[in-house]
Amino acid sequence: MKIALVGYGKMGHIIDKIAQTRGHEIVARLNESPTLENLNNPDVVIEFSSPESAFGNIKFCLEQGIPVVCGTTGWLEKKPEIEKICIENNAAFLYGSNFSLGVNLFFALNEKLAQLMKPFNNDYDCQLEEIHHIHKLDKPSGTAISLAQDIISNSNFEKWKLDETLGKELGIRAIREEEVPGTHIVTYRSEVDEIEIKHTAFNRNGFALGAVIASEWIIGRKGNFTVKEVLGL
């Protein structure tokens, strides 16, 4: 499979190595906007750029009919438009706030816990915390937003908000610290006890491997997809 990497930062470099060990060819490594010339006729694009660049990058590739696997966060207000462009061009688009198997199992655990806690929302206050390296541009992380959305769908919360809150707003505390790959904590606290679930990434390899597996999976498919469908969760 021929892969074009759009966004060649730390994640791009790790994806490059993992993809090659799985027998794939990297035909483009881009930190600039994609064109037909510099993409070099790939079977799929893996997009890990920046919040500012993601929309334009994805839009261009989908309009050429090239499948896109995207892990860039911080641009999701435009995701419905991208999904529409994907359908209009009979293309394939897969977005993941996190491609790690462990995180996606954590998503499922978080959703189940939220369902169990719903009858007790008046007794327990729920808060989220995410910790990432100082180079991460967006706050909160896409993973934290995904966790929050699953909690909101299964609770009395109406929306999430950055920083601690009370009432109908679900608080997300975002910390930027040294070179932390990613830690996410969901806490339910009452006057008498506390329930906590936590996921800690030790490096970026799990994210990168998941992105490569997603790019293998999307070949031959049409439509908008998520990591859950790739992993069968």
Where are these regions (language model features)?
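C-terminal substrate-binding/catalytic lobe of Rossmann-fold NAD(P)-dependent oxidoreductases
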Residues: K2, K10-L39, N122-L233
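Short, acidic/turn-prone active-site loops that include or flank metal/cofactor-
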Residues: E32-P34, T72-L76, F99
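Short acidic/histidine-rich motifs immediately flanking catalytic phosphotransfer sites
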Residues: L39-I46, L62-P67
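Rossmann-fold NAD(P) dinucleotide-binding segment
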Residues: P51-G71, P80-I82
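Rossmann-fold dehydrogenase core element
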Residues: P67, I82-S100, M117, N121
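Rossmann-fold NAD(P)-binding glycine/threonine-rich loop
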Residues: T72-F93, N104, L109-K112
